[in-house]
A protein has these predicted regions:
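Predominantly extracellular/luminal regions of secreted and cell-surface proteins
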Residues: 106, 119, 292-327
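Active-site-proximal segment of zinc-dependent metalloprotease catalytic domains
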Residues: 102-106, 113, 117-251, 257, ...
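Subset of Sec-pathway N-terminal targeting signals
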Residues: 1-59
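Acidic glycine-/aspartate-rich tracts in secreted/extracellular proteins
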Residues: 37-42, 114-117, 243-246, 272-275, ...
Length: 407
């Protein structure tokens, strides 16, 4: 497994066919959400204002790998499993009803409908227009609804390991500013808009350590494609949380490395178009920093930590996969930090069993390693392909109970 531990979801498909006794388990996606802080990215910022680069045109309109299932989020209060292959993963009418973790007290608000920025540390008075791909800032087109939902997925994926709510629902100013005392609700507004006077040649911009101020001090995202827009939101919010840039050698921004499914880059760099983007601790060659992104995100001043562990770390505390029909099982979960593993169990009759464990988002940060055990705890098989970030098995098994460990 890659040393980056931040997150992403591992989706898995479990399928099993049996000749007798227990009915055959047919192919089905089981998915886990991995929230680890594997490669943590960082770099020293020398200025208070932290810009992100402009993404190349068309650099990332299509995901390098499409695993189908989108991150489960709350749509108007109901947990919903979207599909990244759909034009509107969560339904067109739900674009501004999305929330990743609505019970969290800390908020990352993705603001797409325009914003009047005044009375904050930017020292300006600007009415920023709504996000637009076609120049019409009064109405959202189908393409814009689709783009917003898919950018939202990218940001949720990056912050899913943490107890913070990424949302397109306007929480109100009081939920974004920290008034001190007994106030436990605060966050940051990420304004997705058009480049305005004074912000030329920037894909996004933010103030360092602006998360938790007593004012609404937004970050701004000008990159607009699916992944560069999503990554820029995560990058600029990262600055608000206290993160510096991840550079490479003499370059301020790490551009990413590799190709295909295992291409990689740090969120606090500029890895536009790479398949895996992760938080980093600067443990890559020619790094310009040793900053531990995950530890800084979790610092006390920001007010939140990891999410709680959702599945057991041993066979004795494994979660039974849900049997949705006689032949289909289903499940999902979150790997929330570097040392977390999740155990799942299933029972099958004798015969062929196929297992597929995939990161959920189109571009994830979890490189899955999965291990299959029998009821005695003996390892049956392990999967950690070098040319992909998912894991799979195709085994002829005796009837009985089995366990899957996702790492």
């Amino acid at each position: 497994m890659v040393s980056n531990n931040f997150l992403r979801r591992a989706l898995g498909k479990i399928l099993s066919r049996s000749d007798q006794q227990q009915p055959a388990l047919r192919q089905r996606r089981l998915f886990l959400e991995n929230l680890e802080d594997r490669r943590l990215l960082a770099a020293d910022l020398t200025t208070f204002v932290c810009p992100a680069p402009v993404a190349p045109n068309g650099a990332d309109e299509a995901p390098a790998v499409d695993n189908g299932v989108a991150i489960p989020v709350f749509v108007d209060g109901t947990l919903t499993f979207g599909d990244v292959a759909d034009t509107f993963p969560y339904g067109k009418d739900n674009t501004f009803l999305l929330a990743s973790n609505p019970t969290a007290t800390k908020t990352i608000y993705l603001d797409y409908d325009g914003h009047h920025s005044v009375n904050n540390n930017w020292n300006h008075n600007i009415v920023f227009p709504a996000f637009s791909l076609d120049g019409d800032t009064n109405n959202f087109s189908d393409a814009e609804h689709s783009r917003i939902q898919k950018q939202f997925i990218e940001v949720v994926d990056d912050y899913f390991p943490f107890d913070v709510n990424v949302t397109t629902i306007d929480p109100g100013v009081e939920a974004l500013r920290n008034t001190g005392g007994t106030d436990v609700q605060w966050g940051v507004r990420a304004v997705n808009t058009q480049v305005t006077n004074g912000f030329a040649n920037a894909g996004g911009i933010a103030h360092l350590n602006s998360f938790g101020l007593n004012i609404d001090d937004p970050v701004f995202t000008f990159n607009r494609s699916i992944s560069s827009g999503g990554q820029t939101n995560s990058h600029e919010v990262g600055h608000a949380l206290g993160l510096s840039h991840d550079g490479l050698g003499s370059a301020t921004y790490h551009p990413g490395t590799g190709s295909g499914a295992t291409s990689w880059g740090p969120i606090m760099g500029a890895p536009f178009g790479e398949n895996m983007v992760q938080w980093s601790n600067g443990d890559y060659a020619d790094s310009t920093t040793t900053q531990n992104d995950v530890n800084i995100i979790r610092k006390a001043a920001n007010g939140f930590d990891y999410r709680g562990d959702d599945h057991g770390n041993a066979q004795s505390t494994a979660t039974a996969l849900t049997v949705t029909t006689d032949t289909i099982v289903d499940g999902w979960g979150i790997i929330h930090e570097r040392n977390d593993v999740d155990y799942f169990s299933f029972i099958t009759g004798s015969g062929n069993v196929a297992l597929q464990i995939d990161p959920v988002a189109s571009r994830g940060s979890l490189d899955v390693e999965a291990t299959l055990y029998n009821s005695l705890g003996n390892q049956v098989a392990i999967s950690n392909p070098t040319d992909g970030i998912n894991a799979s098995f195709n085994q002829n098994l005796a009837a009985g109970e089995y366990f899957i460990k996702v790492d």
